[in-house]
Amino acid sequence: MRSLFPKEWVIREYTADYGIDLDVELFEECNDGVYITKGEHILFQVKTTNDIEVKDLKVYSKTNSDNCIFKVVKYPLDTALLATVEKMGSAVPVLLCLVDNVEREGYFVCLNDYIDKILISQKPDYDRQGTVTINIPIENRISSGTVAIEWYGKRAKLYSFFNLVNCQNRDLLYTSDCNLEQMVEIFLNRICRLDIWSDQRLKLFKEQIDYYIEHHSTKQADIIINDAIERGENVDEPIWEGTYCMGEVSFRHVTQIQELHRLWDQMCIISDMYETDYREAYLPTYYWSVVNE
């Protein structure tokens, strides 16, 4: 396993056999030859074999109207381990890695996600069995899967982001519009300090945040306001009443306030998308097959 990971990653072995074999801590290079920890950990359950057998797995869509084929490696896993992983929740990824001793390659699948997205829906009483066969896509190779593993490593930080923006969103609902700008500045400063922005799925939101920090208005609000100005409307006359605003305010003000709240609403939706869709990444599911085409 050590030879398959980047040399800067630190691997700690658990000597007692409680189902988890390795704690892999991810590091990154800060300057020439110097590495620092990213504060990201992934747990591994490692199995080995001298005889990898690749099989076809037919997977159907939710409506059973279409299907796809995955090339997988099957491995029987004790349900006691799966039950332990399920109790852990999904914040700390536990990856099953099957190592081919002949080809010196490892194949992985995230057990937390496999349980939630596949196993419980197909076998809700799986814990009554002695073992469950896990289907590991052969595309999930350790040697070429650094990006995927680093994505799993960000999970705890992403969950922290989800909790933070949801809490901030509730606070903003009870913040008067006269105090909103000061509160938003504090909130955005906190969000920007989170180590999550290398995730390409968040690129659009980081661009919107950077735009607000520079212009003190969201990009969408400026588009709406400029369109109104081009139509000859007076955007600064206080004749409007709007959601989140007290008394009569200008079209400019009400638009900036409403679009700012919309930005937080959109950031909160990311957590729903992550749970519903993104956690199927690298799993043998129809959704991942379609997304990965």
Predicted regions, residues:
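Short intrinsically disordered coil segments
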Residues: 37-39, 59-65, 111-114, 125-129
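Generic detector of well-ordered alpha-helical segments enriched in charged/polar residues
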Residues: 2, 82-83, 185, 206
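Detector for Asparagine
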Residues: 31, 50, 64-67, 101, ...
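Generic alpha-helix signal with a bias toward terminal, lower-confidence helices
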Residues: 17, 23, 56-58, 118-120, ...
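Long, low-complexity, intrinsically disordered terminal regions
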Residues: 149-293
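Catalytic centers of nucleases
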Residues: 1-62
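Mixed-charge intrinsically disordered linker/loop segments at interdomain junctions
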Residues: 72-159
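Mg2+/Mn2+-dependent nuclease catalytic core
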Residues: 51-80
